[in-house]
Amino acid sequence: MTRFIIVTLFISLLTAGPDRPYHTTPDREKDMIHMLIDIEVDIQEGRISGSVSHTFTPFSSDCKRVSFDSDRIEIHGVSIKGQALTFQQNGPKLFVNLDKSYGWEDTITVKINYTSHPTMGFYFVRPDSSYPNKQLQGWTQGEDTDNHFWVPMHDYPNDKMTWECRLTVDESLSAISNGELVSVTDNAEQRTFHWRENVPNVSYLLSVAVGDYKKIEDEWDGIPVNYWVYQDHDRNDALRSFGKTPAMLEFFSDVTGVRYPFEKYDQTIIEDFMWGGMENVTNTHQTDRTMHEDDVRPIHSSDGLVAHELAHMWFGDYLTTRNWPNVWLNEGFATYLELLWTEHETDPELAEYERLGNLGATVWADKSYRRPTVQHYYYNSIELFDSNIYAKGSVIINMIRRYLGDDGFFRGLKQYTRTHAANNVETTDLKKVFEVTTGKNLDWFFEQWVYKPGVPEITANYRYNRRSQLVSLTLKQTQDVESTSLFKLPMVVVIDDGNINRYNIFFDKVEDTFTFPAEMEPLMVGVDEGFQIPKRLTFEKKTDELLYQLKNAPVPNDRIWAARALKETRSTKKIHSALVEMLSAEPKWYVRREIVNTYQSLKPRNGAADLMAAYDGQDDRVKRAIISALREYETDDVKSFLLDVIENEQNDYLVSSALYALIKIDLDAAKEKFDWAMEQESHSETI
């Protein structure tokens, strides 16, 4: 499930502390083998009707009663081989009294006939008088535990099974589900689609998507790859959003050491989706907002979303968390493989910049609602889907990589995927594989980063001794070690004394001083080069060193740190001139965007002219930052500039940003554009 979380689920529903109930993996009374769903989907009535048959073996030698998760579902009857069984419904549970006592060696199939009008788990989209152009759709969203609101089932990720779906829908619609399409049968004004998933998986990954779809076919290495889009989309539209999928399949198969393990890979767009995407096994649901025209690139791209959801086919689907407290194993790996794709396909330094964003989200989450990554205390498991599993999860995996090195990390990653293929996993499984593969004891690492909350708070300062030609770097950990940890921190210190010198240190004390040789007083000293570790760093530097670092640090993330640090300095012409110079000299667009943000925060008197002069030739993402910065300057020149952007730029997001800026500086001028703006068709109605 993608990380488009609304204010991180209201800051994880404010807190996630030990005052909440403790949760661990629930016991199982039976081992699920197969599930056969045979239903009619009535979108207009919002109704599911039919049956589900569960095949399982008991764990006990005297099994007389079994239960299924079933909430607000009308049960018409339960049977074994046509023989009716008695049953009771109690809250979210359906209890079934078996016809006799069964043992662990028996295989049982229980059939449940039912009707549901679900308000969760299965959603219906219909056109109405307010939105006459809406699609007619029905689709599922099972994660975390919502599928049992529309079909009785075992609804927890500690068991895997195969399943089939026979879906009867209106003859004008298609019904897509997991696995292979076995058959399509035409009935009177209806069609029945029979799908079968042959690889055992957890029930929240069950997918049903019903709608008026067009299938765009693709393939990778003999595996069908399909894009289910709307009738007004063509092949180019589908490929614009999803066309890199085959290359991603190739890359992820290589990096995990496991060839894509399922029958096919479909991506189905849906309307009114509450998330960005959902990694239902072999049939990912994607928000239809990801469809776009070329004009909105690079501000909008589907690549990250597509990579994230596809990565889940290995981490989340093939290997699935055994319980919700360990769900970071799903989301952290998917988020990190998204970065690996950027590193592989685009630019390793851009991937590092994206990782810097995850690092920032990790620190923000810790400040807002401190909790460990593996969290057993919660009211509802959906509370856990926050930055601690997505952003921090990916940061943890990156730190493992940096500590073990690429060779050890990628060998361990492949061994982890192969060892636990098609199984459930917990954090201990990952830790053990990396320890066995590399010989490293990782107790300390997982204890401080996974099982305990918090991030280090570090103050840094240094002195240079000209006589000894030594730099003395003093580091202090200032966090409350009682509530978090005294962190063990392997880091790289970079010193520029006319030459770039890097030194590996291991900082594991409250305070420590490290010395390094330097032939002259350093032009720049950096702690944790590239910012690999989530932390709050206080490192006061003189303006000249910050400007030098902005221009000369070899790693873009360190140049970004300098740009951000300059926001806290006194605004001077020297700084303004340096920032303007770097808007053209800096090679990376993402560093230039940070420079624009710094320039805006310093509010130079002639800032508008400098920003407008720097606009042409910039990456659209930098242009958008410039437009946003111009909101601070209410002048006729800026108004004319914004009107020119509105009338001539092709990227919807630039036009939208210019309109918002114009509202702030000249509301009357913006009102004159209102009718025009309302008539524009734009991506996600951004204009």
Predicted regions and their residues:
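Extended, low-hydrophobicity, Ser/Thr/Pro/Gly-biased non-transmembrane segments
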Residues: N113-Y213, E217
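Long, helix-rich interaction regions
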Residues: S12, E581-E594, L602-R605, A609-I687
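A surface-exposed beta-strand-loop module
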Residues: D71-Y131, K509-E521
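Non-catalytic accessory/interaction domains
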Residues: V169, A311, D407, H420-A609, ...
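Ligand-binding face of N-terminal immunoglobulin V-set domains in extracellular IgSF glycoproteins
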Residues: R47-D71
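N-terminal, polar/Ser/Thr-rich
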Residues: L13-S49, N133-Q137, P157, G439-Q448
